[in-house]
Amino acid sequence: TGGCGLLNCLNVNAQRPIIQTKYTADPAPMVYNDTVFLYTTHDEDDAEGFKMQDWLLYTSTDMVNWTDHGVVASLKSFDWVKRDNGAWAEQVVERNGKFYMYCPIHGNGIGVLVSDSPYGPFKDPLGKPLVWQKEHWDDIDPTVFIDEDGQAYMYWGNPNCYYVKLNEDMISYSGDIVKLKETPEHYQEGPWFYKRNGHYYLAFASTCCPEGIGYA
């Protein structure tokens, strides 16, 4: 595509693991027009702890061969972010032809970026966090689920799980932030919400540390 020329795309052959030349984590897949868009976090290799400044994108049409599109967004995408670390686990969803990237900035809440293309460029429509509970650092690992009736929800949090009802514009919400009264046993972080055959499922990073995968 034209975007590949600008981003200097690289072809990545299918191997295990898929990504071998960069330190990536928190893969967030989205299927759109028969293509898997895999958004990831990116950890630099010159620090002992987390040093995460941007988000990357990989795509595949066969789940075997992958194209590296490089950096799709970064902390610099948010003018209100003054730190150079903390680009944690993101997720991108599509609605009405637009693509919304929900980005936690560790210690600064959750921001949202919008694009007309899943390849970007992603821009900040708010100029401020979508969610920021300043009394703690729980606001990480957002996931967005759109139910069959069109209502969108955003879930997030560590060690508690919260949610809000997103408005149709996907960049604002109605009502209060709700903390789940009964957090699933061993819930730690990284919620993902699904619906199948009339049942709702919450998958999450479980226990710590190391973490496993749990569901409820």
Report each predicted region and the residues it spans:
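Bacterial Sec-dependent N-terminal signal peptides
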Residues: 1-15
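Carbohydrate-active catalytic/glycan-binding domains of CAZyme proteins
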Residues: 12-216
